Amino acid sequence: MSFPRVGVLALQGDTREHLTALREAGADSMPVRRRGELDEVDALVIPGGESTTISHLLLDCELLEPLRARLADGLPAYGACTGMILLASEILDAGVCGREALPLGAIDITVRRNAFGRQVDSFEGDIGFAGLVDPVRAVFIRAPWVERAGDGVQVLAQAAGHAVAVRQGSMLATAFHPEMTSDRRIHQLFVDIVNGIA
């Protein structure tokens, strides 16, 4: 089996942790900060951070439209927390005028930013995850949740009555941060998706 080259958008967030988790899951991983680097990867992880900031960094780095184009052409992507927000087709509470989070439109979901509350309301807990025998330890930090999932979207996990992990084809998104634990099953799932075996 080949080792896919999976990029991690390295504008903000847990870049190093995702790079390590991807390597441990069997991928060749690299940071992506420029368009040329985006062109080199077989798949992309969009890490957590602050969604309006990352949106505007994508604009400043002239990555927003090239990323939208690659996603539309079928680039597999995994978004964690902010990554889930950005991969969505619609964002509720997107921010103030001129500083909104900009949806990439890769997954047919509507997400609500900061749905679980502010930074002080962050928490972690064990949740069931479709296809995995044992629960996943999920770290939620100012996390979103899914308000609406389209017909082609599979809900993989729920918390507090809302979807917090979804998949649509080769797109995967979680409201939580698996890179902050030693459990590599979510990253392994994404690598398997990229390799066409999940």
From Swiss-Prot:
One of its GO terms (molecular function) is pyridoxal 5'-phosphate synthase (glutamine hydrolysing) activity. L-glutamine binds at residues 49-51, 113, 141-142. Pathway: Cofactor biosynthesis; pyridoxal 5'-phosphate biosynthesis. The active site is at residues 81, 177, 179. One of its GO terms (biological process) is pyridoxine metabolic process. Keywords: Glutamine amidotransferase, Hydrolase, Lyase, Pyridoxal phosphate. The keyword Protein transport does not apply. It catalyses: aldehydo-D-ribose 5-phosphate + D-glyceraldehyde 3-phosphate + L-glutamine = pyridoxal 5'-phosphate + L-glutamate + phosphate + 3 H2O + H(+); L-glutamine + H2O = L-glutamate + NH4(+). Its EC number is 4.3.3.6, 3.5.1.2. One of its GO terms (cellular component) is cytosol. Belongs to the glutaminase PdxT/SNO family. PANTHER family: PYRIDOXAL 5'-PHOSPHATE SYNTHASE SUBUNIT SNO, PYRIDOXAL 5'-PHOSPHATE SYNTHASE SUBUNIT SNO1-RELATED. This is Pyridoxal 5'-phosphate synthase subunit PdxT. The lineage of its organism: Bacteria, Bacillati, Actinomycetota, Actinomycetes, Mycobacteriales.
